[in-house]
Structure formats: structure tokens, C-alpha cells
Design a protein with these regions (language model features):
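Alpha-to-beta junction loops
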Residues: 54, 72-81, 93-96, 125-126, ...
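Pocket-lining segment of extracytoplasmic ligand-binding domains
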Residues: 83-84, 164-256
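Bilobed "Venus flytrap"/periplasmic-binding protein-like clamshell domains
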Residues: 23-47, 107-110, 115, 119-187, ...
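Conserved C-terminal helix/tail region of periplasmic/extracytoplasmic solute-binding proteins
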Residues: 291-321
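Short beta-strand-to-loop elements that line the ligand-binding cleft
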Residues: 55-63, 80, 152-162
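Hydrophobic/proline-rich hinge and linker segments of small-molecule sensing/allosteric domains
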Residues: 98-118, 210-221, 225
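Secondary-structure end/capping motifs
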Residues: 224-301
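A structural signal for short loop-to-beta-strand junctions that line the ligand-binding cleft
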Residues: 26-28, 93-101, 126-130, 204-209
């Protein structure tokens, strides 16, 4: 009898230990060209950054749209996307939510010897634009031009395309300026091209002083509520990994192959831009600023970008508790 009790007790002890050691698996969809891959690589490479309460399952996605499909179908738990999309989904009853990842957005870039020195100088010029007519950088740049009495859409010859193709357009002198996402703009700057204005400068020109994150982690609120400790631990570890990449040359050296370039100047510019994009402040002021940006984008896109909701949906932003 005693041996049976001992055996049962031993089994219960082993089961409890196994349960306690069980980690939450976080399935995250990652684009090969994105900077999130750098951060996750650093996180997984350093034993000190590996918390005991989660493990990552990284699933490659071809592009942003593929990531959205994977998230909505339940193939992954998290992707990186923008809060405008999250708000539009919540307006339809979905329970997705957003936690900030980066303050970086886009930049307006010209050749170093270009006569273009301001937005007004774009009049009559050829402009390459990453994305489409509803790209947020493009909409906000038009809003800033309107403040200077310039109808930018009517004043330039527009070429829309994928970010790498837009960079090729300016290299081949097929356009006079490009509006591209930050890491593609950084590659041009490292090769001698000149920045006219970046996303933060555009927002400041529109009266938004706060740094508002352009992209972040997107996931189901219900899923996060069930795995609160693990997801909050993941966000904390991600910030620590970013800090390591920005302060440790040894850590940065390990992710250099992920930059997909052998050019040291480009590598340096990418690291600088990545580190400048860290989210240091995310509170009520920044979220109120996001609501003002939402209102602008709703008007500028004639509801096409935001959907019919007049304001940013409650619950769009996830709060660590």
C-alpha cells in the first residue's frame, strides 16, 4: 500500500513539474525582408534573453498581405502590421489588437545633386511611391503639401510599385524622387542619396509632435488574454534584444547576414535607422495622437483606408498589465 501511495505521489510530482515547465508556443509570421527577423534572431541567440514561459515558432510569410491572411486564418498568432488595419477589423467585430514595435515609417529621397530641396520643389517632377494610392506615407505627404497650397497628386507624375522596384526607378533615373519605407530609403542614403523629409517630419508638419508607432505586433485580444504572462514576457524580451543589437557590436555582427547586403555603409545606416525607431514612450498622449492621425487619414482616403468608422476603435491598442 505504501509503495502504491509513493508511486502515485511521484507521478503527481512529475506531472506538476512537467506542467510548470511547459512553455507557451508563440507562432509568429515574419517577412524575410523585415527587421523583426533581426530582433527574433538576437532573442533566440542569447540564452539570457530566453524567458522560461514562452518559445517562438517562426513562420516565414511572403509579404504583408500573406501575413494578414495567415493571422486571420489562425495559421499564426502574431504578425507585424499597422493599427489602422487593426481598427478597421475591430469595426467589423474582430478582436485583433496592436502593441507597438517601431516608430519608423518612410522617407522622401532624392539624388544628392537634385534641385529638389522641399516638398514644393516636387511640382512637375516624377515621383516614385512605395505601395499604392492609399499608402499612409503618401496620404500624409499630400496633406502636408496641401498646407503649402500644393495639390501634390495633380502636380507630380506618379509611379507606384513595390519598395525594391521604387529604389531601382531612382537609380535608373526614371523618377526624380521616391517616397519609400525607411529601410529601403536607408539603403539609398547610404549610397549618397539625400533625404528631404521623413515620416516623423511629415507628422510634425501636420501638428503631431508625439512619436506615434507606425507598425506593431498584431494578435487576437482573446488569445493574448489567455496567454498574458507569455506575451508580455515576449514583448519585454524583444525590447531587450533590440537594445542588445543597438549597444553590442558582437550581437549586431551575428544578424548582419539578415540585412541581405555586404555593403558596410548600408549595414551601418540600417542599424542606425533600426535603433532610432525604438518605441521609448507609449502612453495616453501617443494614443491620442494616433486618434488624430486616424481622423486625418479617414478624410484623406475618403474612408477607403480606414473603413466607415468615424474614429479609432476602442481596444485597438493592447495594454501590458
Amino acid at each position: 500500500m505504501k509503495s502504491n501511495v509513493f508511486f502515485i505521489g511521484l507521478c503527481l510530482f512529475a506531472s506538476c513539474n512537467s506542467f510548470a515547465a511547459e512553455k507557451t508556443t508563440i507562432r509568429i509570421g515574419v517577412q524575410a525582408s523585415g527587421t523583426l527577423q533581426w530582433e527574433l534572431s538576437a532573442l533566440q541567440d542569447d540564452p539570457q534573453l530566453k524567458p522560461a514561459d514562452f518559445q517562438l515558432e517562426i513562420q516565414p510569410v511572403a509579404n504583408a498581405e500573406a501575413g494578414k491572411i495567415a493571422l486571420q486564418s489562425g495559421a499564426v498568432d502574431i504578425i507585424v502590421s499597422d493599427w489602422i488595419w487593426v481598427s478597421s477589423l475591430r469595426a467589423t467585430g474582430a478582436d485583433f489588437t496592436f502593441y507597438p514595435y517601431s516608430n519608423n515609417s518612410g522617407s522622401l529621397i532624392v539624388p544628392n545633386n537634385s534641385p529638389i530641396h522641399s516638398i514644393k520643389d516636387l511640382k512637375g517632377k516624377r515621383l516614385g511611391i512605395a505601395g499604392g494610392e492609399l499608402d499612409k506615407n503618401w496620404l500624409l505627404l499630400q496633406a502636408l503639401a496641401q498646407k503649402e497650397q500644393l495639390d501634390l497628386s495633380a502636380s507630380v507624375e506618379k509611379t507606384f510599385g513595390a519598395p525594391p522596384l521604387i529604389n531601382e526607378q531612382i537609380k535608373q533615373n526614371r523618377v526624380d524622387a521616391v517616397l519609400n519605407y525607411w529601410h529601403f530609403a536607408a539603403r539609398l542614403e547610404a549610397q549618397g542619396y539625400r533625404q528631404i523629409i521623413d515620416g516623423r517630419g511629415i507628422l510634425k508638419g501636420l501638428g503631431i509632435a508625439e512619436n506615434v508607432p507606425s507598425i506593431g505586433y498584431v494578435f487576437k485580444q482573446s488569445w493574448a488574454a489567455d496567454h498574458k504572462q507569455a506575451i508580455n514576457s515576449f514583448f519585454k524580451a524583444g525590447k531587450q534584444a533590440r537594445n542588445q543589437l543597438c549597444t553590442s557590436n558582437a550581437a549586431w555582427k551575428k544578424v548582419i547576414p539578415l540585412t541581405q547586403t555586404d555593403d558596410v555603409a548600408i549595414q551601418t545606416k540600417l542599424r542606425q535607422g533600426y535603433c532610432n525607431g525604438g518605441v521609448d514612450q507609449w502612453g495616453e498622449k501617443e494614443q491620442q495622437a494616433a486618434a488624430r492621425i486616424y481622423t486625418m487619414l479617414r478624410t484623406l482616403s475618403n474612408n477607403q483606408l480606414t473603413g466607415k468608422s468615424e474614429s479609432l476603435q476602442p481596444g485597438t491598442f493592447w495594454s501590458i498589465q
